[in-house]
Structure formats: structure tokens, C-alpha cells
């Protein structure tokens, strides 16, 4: 690492990140109080951005023990292009649709002052295929459910009415990506008309739920967004060998099945293969895909310049774009497995594009793409390249073959050193060819620009080529070691600097603006949120409004986010980073002067007020240099160190969400229909009388059952009569007729009441209507000579009539005889003498007793 780079990193860490919440929108500042930085119009890797809004990202860690690969006589360095793939841990996501019918039975108590819900019972049922067709095309369903349980068939109808076709309408939901369509969103809880009675109301709701489902490799099960689990592979079609642990008769596949979007009802979409699964309480369907729709590998990075160091037992792929060294356990490449064929097209396309960019300096000859698996579980796609300068010398050497010397001019024997050098070169070439993962490059066709094959310069060219190759490989080894050592030191420095400001360090590593934060011993890296560059303005004043002693230590910035018209305020950080806070303040100092860099400019503030703007070149730059250390180091094959395995990390979590949801769904299916909401019943006890009466009838056996049936029959008959009367009253003709009859009865009652009142007030006039006229004639003397009888005679007549009436009543009672109750009472008196009332028929005894009683008083 150069001193210039270390110094720049230290300068970048001068401002500590203050991670606070986002501010509320502010009013734009007047133009006279702001200055527009030219960095908003420049193309830079560090635009104005906000890095405090990102909450998560990719996890990285710095290696604590990095050692560089060694270079020796047995090593071979090769340049090339490298693509790195990792396991795809992102689950396979696909759309699913759930169909269900929810039957809700509510027991309503009609109280004197208020109505109460004393019980609620809810059951869910799956939907048959003939009804799912209607729900998927015209969004209609039947509002009834027919089910058979324990040999008893029951039919539930919405609103306790008749089975009709109803429409499904969109409803709201809480989960993201979930859309529901329901036929009945309101529960039927109307109480009965009779007070102090219970009434059961039924609600049937057809529900469609569109959501997402996820499944991880090896696809033994998948989970929906709402937590429903299915113990099968989403790629199972009934014929392949995918995982299937559901009931065999619950799954079927339909071809050319059509699903219409709710907004596009009436259209004819393209058919698809769709799987249907009956879970008992709901039905699931999803588009059936092949396993090839999911790629088990994910592209991580592509390195344009990579050095492959072959050590005899392993290959080290060292890149110049980061402190990365990929080690393989073998020196022979493999063919791409069939399970990973999904990346072949991407690899070929990327390698072709990268090679076209460097083909003026490198050639690949007939080299093919080779694949390696690292000890850390990564898949490497490797394309070796050869510099064109070395390829020319190599072709000349291969085209030139030694020939026997003519007798006239025998060639002198080679010295021992030369022979050793030549044999060593051949040995290294053979070892290199045996260690290469790719097929050896065949000799190229002879060119027309070369001389004869017995060229005396052949040995010299061969020696020159071997020496050149040895020197180039040694130089590449020295460069690789020096570069690796520098990266090792930089790794240690950066690891310590991330404890101070991880955002600045990771931004310098990536070469672009990123957000980073430490999570214990690892670093989370995520993208920053760019702002609208055209709206960024700097405040000219750094003084805190309303305070004479406090000033801002960093200038204020006004900005707006992209696609947002609201203006926000923050403070300018290092490398155009904007902090969503105005907490960086200090006590105002006299004659202060600050320099703040923004793009290619530096803003100068004197006495906390913008003074001028100068060019970045106006400030001198410190130059540092680190000498290259070419000392040899031994080769070390690093093993992949994993502090905690994936299974251990899963086991360390208290909440196993997969296990919880799977167990919950298993238990929920077993107890479906048995759940009751008894909170109101327990607190108020309004149905205890009904439960107690039911237990009493059950204890009586057949007698209690007969009584219950009799009461139910009578109650049902009475309820039917009342319901019929209410239905007849609701009819227009019946209601009018009943109103007319009620009006007639009211008029009749009023007439009889008046007649009775007249009878009680003037009984003689009611019995003899002409008595008033006769009295008037008698008073005027015009009528016949009729004189009224005396009052004594009238009373005698009335007394005679009364006695006659009483005598007729006694005669009727004697003729009727004693009643049953009287005879029973008389029999009891005869059996129990103590109950008899004593009668004293003897006058003397009665007189004696009366005398004794008078004496006592």
C-alpha cells in the first residue's frame, strides 16, 4: 500500500458517520443564501448520496491470517479470465393461489337490553375443481357448502337462505404481495325476533388468496406467504422423482388451464400446466415448472485479470482486483455438471465479451473454458490467456525441430550446463502440460514467413525461450508476492480502520460509494441512496440559527430525492456523502477557516461564511512510495476456515420458523372445526342454563331425549308458524290484508267498549230503549194511565230474582257432582283423620266450650 493511499484513507476518516433517522421535509432555502456546487454536473464515482437509509446488505469479513502463495521452480503462472459462482441461497419463488370456503356459525342471544354473541364456530373447506373453474375465469362461486362427517350430510348456506351464485370482490390485506377476493365480508349476526332466546346464524364466504411461495433446495417442501406449508416439491408433476409426501388422491395436474386476471375478466388468456392440491381445509394451485427454472448457482464476480499459480498439488487463482485467492484441491479441471448447465450460456457470453476487450494484447488459441471447484465451495470458470509476445516465441519454437548434423560439419556437443538447462526446460514443459486442466494446445500450422527447419539458431531460440519463460515466470512470481504482501498489509490496516469508519473504508475498496456498518466481527455492505444531483445546494452560512455562540462544523446541504419534490436538509460529509443530521456543531471560533471538498472544487469558509471556491489542483498532494520486496516465500495452501457452520447457525436460533409453521399447520388441520371463542360465555355465563338443561336431558336417557324431541317439535312448530306469519306479513297482499283486519278489530273493540260503558252507566235505557219516552209521557200526563210501583215492591221483586238465580246455581252444582280435586282431597281426609276438621254438632258440648272460653278471657 502506498503512503498516498494510506493518507487518503486517514483523511476520509476525519468525519465520523452519525447515523440518525431521516429528517422531516424542509422548505427550500432562498437562492441568495446557497451556492450550487459544480460536482452536481460532474461524472464521479462519489455523487451526492445518503448512506444512512440502508438497513441490511451483503456480509463480509477480513481474513485474520492471509499468506501469499509461494513461487518456485515447479510453479507455473498463467494469466486469464475468471468467473466465480456461489451457491444460490435465495429460495425459489413462485405464485400460488389458494381456494377455500369459510363457514362461520354464530350463536346470538337476544337479551332485554342488548344482544350478545355467546359462541362462534368456524370451519374451512376445500373447493372442488368444477367450482375453481368458475372462480378462476368469472370470479363467481356458490354460497353453499355440502359436507359429510361421520355419515351425516350437512349443507351450510350463506345467510341461512338458498344456494345461489355470488360474485367475488377484492378485499384488503396486511401482508405484502397478498391479494384476496371474497364473496362475503360481513358476518351474519342478526338475533332472533323472540326475546331471551338463542339463534344460530350461518355465514359462507368464498375466498381466493393470491400470494407467493418459496422453496429451498432440495425442494422437499414449500411455504406460502401466509404460512401454509406443503410437504412436496413445487416441481412434482405426478410422474417425475421429485419429493411428494401428501395424500396421493389430493394432487392432480391440469393442462391448458386458464386463469383470468380480475382486471381482465372476459378475456381468453393462454393456457398453462397447473398443479392442484387438496389440503382438506383449502385447495392450492400453481403453475407447474421444470426444475431447470431454478439455477442452483449464482454469479458472484468476474475478474478481468487473474494469475493462476500451479504448485503441483493445487492451483491458486490470484486476482488483481481484490485481496482474493481461490485455491483448488486439484490441478485438473472438470466438465460442467448437468446440474449446473444453467450457467453455461452466461459463462460463454461473458467470456466472449471480456476476451474481445483484451484480444489486442492476449490470445487464447484453442484453449477452452475449464471449471474448478475450490475448497471453499465455489465454482470457478477459467479461460487461460497468453500474451501475444510470448505466443509468437512459442510458435517459433514449436515450428523449429532439431536435425542431425551433416558429416562435413559436425556440431560440438552441448556443455553439461546447457544439457541440464535443456532437460530441465523439457521436464518443466511436460509437467506444465500434465498439470493443465484444459486440453493441451495442438501445434499450429507452419507459417510461410519462417526459414528452413535446420536453422542453426534453433538451439539459441529454444534457450532464449526457456530463459525468457523462466525469467518472466520469476518476475510474475515476484510481482504476485509483492502484490499479495501489500494486500496483506492493506487488509490489516483496513480491518482496523473499519472499526472507526466502515463506510469510508469499504467505499475506498469498492471504488464507489457504498454504505457499511460493523455487525460484530463482520461488515454489512449495501448500496447508498443517490439524491437528485441538480437539487443539491450548499448553505453559505455555517452558523446555527438563533444562537450566537454555536456553529456547524460541516456545511448544511439542501437536497431532494429522485422522483420526490420535497426538500430535505443535512450536512455535507466526506466525498459528497450527505448526513441526515444537523448535530455536528461546535463553539464558534474567531478567525476560523475551513476547506470542504466537493468534486473537483474546494469550498472555503471564513468565519463560518462561504468565502470563495477554488480548484482542487490548488492544494498540493503528498506522494509516497513503497519499494517492491522480491523475497521468496513458501507456498501454503489455506484451508477454508468456518467458525460456525450453517447447521450450527440455524441451531443457535431460538425460533425455528420453518419448524414452527410446519407444526402449526399440522396441528391446525387436526383441530379444525373444534375451536370455539368462549370468552364472552365464560365471563357472562349466558349459556350456562342451556348447557345445564342439555346435560339434564342427557342424564334422563330416552325419556330426556323424548322430552327434548317434543320440546324441539313444539318449538319448531311454533317457530314455523311465527316464521310463516312473518313471511305472510312481508308479502304485500298479506300485509295489506292483516292491516285491514287489525283496523276492523280495533273499530269493533272501540264499539263494544262504548256499548259496555253505556250499559254500566244506563242499564235501564239499554234494556228498555223506550223508557225515556214513556217517562216523558207519564210526566206530561199524555200517556196511558200507568203508575210506577213503590220502592218496597221493587226491592221485593229484585230480591226474588236474586234468590231464584242462586237456587239455579246450586241445583246445577249438585247435578254436576264433586270435582276430581275435591274427591282426592276428601279421600286424603278420610285416610288421615288428623286432617279432618272437627265439627261440634252437640249443642251442649259447644255451649260448655264457649263458656270455658269466656271464663278464660
Swiss-Prot record:
GO terms for cellular component: host cell endosome membrane; host cell Golgi membrane; host cell plasma membrane; membrane; viral envelope; virion membrane. Residues 398-452, 832-857 are annotated as: Disordered. The record marks 432-433 as: Cleavage. It is a single-pass type I membrane protein. Keywords: Disulfide bond, Glycoprotein, Host cell membrane, Host endosome, Host Golgi apparatus, Host membrane, Host-virus interaction, Membrane, Signal, Transmembrane, Transmembrane helix, Viral attachment to host cell, Viral envelope protein, Virion, Virus entry into host cell. The chain crosses the membrane at residues 733-753. It is found in: Virion membrane; Host cell membrane; Host endosome membrane; Host Golgi apparatus membrane. Residues 678-730, 709-729 are annotated as: Hydrophobic membrane proximal region. Residues 404-416 have a biased composition (Pro residues). Gene3D superfamilies: 1.20.5.1890, 2.30.29.100, 2.30.30.1230, 6.10.250.3280. This is Envelope glycoprotein B. Residues 754-857 are intravirion.
Amino acid at each position: 500500500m502506498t503512503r498516498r493511499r494510506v493518507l487518503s484513507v486517514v483523511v476520509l476518516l476525519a468525519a465520523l458517520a452519525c447515523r440518525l433517522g431521516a429528517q422531516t421535509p424542509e422548505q427550500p432555502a432562498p437562492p441568495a443564501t446557497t451556492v450550487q456546487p459544480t460536482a452536481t454536473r460532474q461524472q464521479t464515482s462519489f455523487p451526492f448520496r445518503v448512506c444512512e437509509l440502508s438497513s441490511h446488505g451483503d456480509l463480509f469479513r477480513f481474513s485474520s491470517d492471509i499468506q501469499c502463495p509461494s513461487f518456485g521452480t515447479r510453479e507455473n503462472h498463467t494469466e486469464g479470465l475468471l468467473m466465480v459462482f456461489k451457491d444460490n441461497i435465495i429460495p425459489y419463488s413462485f405464485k400460488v393461489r389458494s381456494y377455500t370456503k369459510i363457514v362461520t356459525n354464530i350463536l346470538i342471544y337476544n337479551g332485554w337490553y342488548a344482544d350478545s354473541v355467546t359462541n362462534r364456530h368456524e370451519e374451512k373447506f376445500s373447493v372442488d375443481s368444477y367450482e375453481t373453474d368458475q372462480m378462476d375465469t368469472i370470479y363467481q362461486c356458490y354460497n353453499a357448502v355440502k359436507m359429510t362427517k361421520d355419515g351425516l350430510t350437512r349443507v351450510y348456506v350463506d345467510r341461512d337462505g338458498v344456494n345461489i351464485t355470488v360474485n367475488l370482490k377484492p378485499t384488503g390485506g396486511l401482508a405484502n404481495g397478498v391479494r384476496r377476493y371474497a364473496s362475503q365480508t360481513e358476518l351474519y349476526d342478526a338475533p332472533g325476533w323472540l326475546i331471551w332466546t338463542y339463534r344460530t346464524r350461518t355465514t359462507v364466504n368464498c375466498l381466493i388468496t393470491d400470494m407467493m411461495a418459496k422453496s429451498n433446495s432440495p425442494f422437499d417442501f414449500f411455504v406460502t406467504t401466509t404460512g401454509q406449508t406443503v410437504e412436496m416439491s413445487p416441481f412434482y408433476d405426478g410422474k417425475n422423482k421429485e419429493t411428494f409426501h401428501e395424500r396421493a388422491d389430493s394432487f392432480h395436474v391440469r393442462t391448458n388451464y386458464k386463469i383470468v386476471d380480475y382486471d381482465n375478466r372476459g378475456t381468453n388468456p393462454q393456457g398453462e400446466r397447473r398443479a392442484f392440491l387438496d389440503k382438506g381445509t383449502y385447495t392450492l394451485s400453481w403453475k407447474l415448472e421444470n426444475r431447470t427454472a431454478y439455477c442452483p448457482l449464482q454469479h458472484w464476480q468476474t475478474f478481468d485479470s487473474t494469475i493462476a499459480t500451479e504448485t503441483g498439488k493445487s492451483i491458486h487463482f490470484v486476482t488483481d482486483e481484490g485481496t482474493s485467492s481461490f485455491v483448488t484441491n486439484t490441478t485438473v479441471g472438470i466438465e460442467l455438471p448437468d446440474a449446473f448447465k444453467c450457467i453455461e450460456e452466461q459463462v460463454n457470453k461473458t467470456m466472449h465479451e471480456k476476451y474481445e476487450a483484451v484480444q489486442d494484447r492476449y490470445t487464447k488459441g484453442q484453449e477452452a473454458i475449464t471449471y474448478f471447484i475450490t475448497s471453499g465451495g465455489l465454482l470457478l470458470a477459467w479461460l487461460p490467456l497468453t500474451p501475444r509476445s510470448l505466443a509468437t516465441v512459442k510458435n517459433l519454437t514449436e515450428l523449429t525441430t532439431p536435425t542431425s548434423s551433416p558429416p562435413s560439419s559436425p556440431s560440438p556437443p552441448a556443455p553439461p550446463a546447457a544439457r541440464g538447462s535443456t532437460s530441465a526446460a523439457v521436464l518443466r514443459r511436460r509437467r506444465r502440460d500434465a498439470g493443465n486442466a484444459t486440453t493441451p494446445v495442438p501445434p499450429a500450422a507452419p507459417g510461410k514467413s519462417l526459414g528452413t527447419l535446420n536453422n542453426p539458431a534453433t538451439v539459441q531460440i529454444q534457450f532464449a525461450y526457456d530463459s525468457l519463460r523462466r525469467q518472466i515466470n520469476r518476475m510474475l512470481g515476484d510481482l504476485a508476492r509483492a502484490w499479495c504482501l501489500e494486500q496483506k498489509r492493506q487488509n490489516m490496516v483496513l480491518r482496523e480502520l473499519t472499526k472507526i469508519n466502515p463506510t469510508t473504508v469499504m467505499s475506498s475498496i469498492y471504488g464507489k460509494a457504498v454504505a457499511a456498518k460493523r455487525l460484530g466481527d463482520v461488515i454489512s455492505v449495501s448500496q447508498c441512496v443517490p439524491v437528485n444531483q441538480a437539487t443539491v445546494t450548499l448553505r453559505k452560512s455555517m452558523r446555527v440559527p438563533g444562537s450566537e455562540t454555536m456553529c456547524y462544523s460541516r456545511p448544511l446541504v439542501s437536497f431532494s430525492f429522485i422522483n420526490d419534490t420535497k426538500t430535505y436538509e443535512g450536512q455535507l460529509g466526506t466525498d459528497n456523502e450527505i448526513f441526515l443530521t444537523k448535530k455536528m456543531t461546535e463553539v464558534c471560533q474567531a478567525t476560523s477557516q475551513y476547506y470542504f471538498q466537493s468534486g473537483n472544487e474546494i469550498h472555503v469558509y471564513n468565519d463560518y461564511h462561504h468565502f470563495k471556491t477554488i480548484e482542487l489542483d490548488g492544494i498540493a498532494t503528498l506522494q509516497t512510495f513503497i519499494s517492491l520486496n522480491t523475497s521468496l516465500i513458501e507456498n501454503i495452501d489455506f484451508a477454508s476456515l468456518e467458525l460456525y457452520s450453517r447447521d450450527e447457525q440455524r441451531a443457535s436460533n431460538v425460533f425455528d420458523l420453518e419448524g414452527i409453521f410446519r407444526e402449526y399447520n399440522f396441528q391446525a388441520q387436526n383441530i379444525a372445526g373444534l375451536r370455539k371463542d368462549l370468552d364472552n360465555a365464560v365471563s357472562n355465563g349466558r349459556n350456562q342454563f342451556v348447557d345445564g338443561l342439555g346435560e339434564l336431558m342427557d342424564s334422563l336417557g330416552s325419556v330426556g331425549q323424548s322430552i327434548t324431541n317434543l320440546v324441539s317439535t313444539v318449538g319448531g312448530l311454533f317457530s314455523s308458524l311465527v316464521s310463516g306469519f312473518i313471511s305472510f306479513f312481508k308479502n304485500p297482499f298479506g300485509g295489506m290484508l292483516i292491516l285491514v283486519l287489525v283496523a276492523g278489530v280495533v273499530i269493533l273493540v272501540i264499539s263494544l267498549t262504548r256499548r259496555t260503558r253505556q250499559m254500566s252507566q244506563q242499564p235501564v235505557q239499554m234494556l228498555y230503549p223506550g223508557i225515556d219516552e214513556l217517562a216523558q209521557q207519564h210526566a206530561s200526563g199524555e200517556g196511558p194511565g200507568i203508575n210506577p210501583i213503590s220502592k218496597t215492591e221493587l226491592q221485593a221483586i229484585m230480591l226474588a230474582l236474586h234468590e231464584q238465580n242462586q237456587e239455579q246455581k246450586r241445583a246445577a252444582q249438585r247435578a254436576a257432582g264433586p270435582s276430581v280435586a275435591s274427591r282426592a282431597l276428601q279421600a286424603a281426609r278420610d285416610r288421615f283423620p288428623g286432617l279432618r276438621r272437627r265439627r261440634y254438632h252437640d249443642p251442649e258440648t259447644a255451649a260448655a266450650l264457649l263458656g270455658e272460653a269466656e271464663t278464660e278471657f
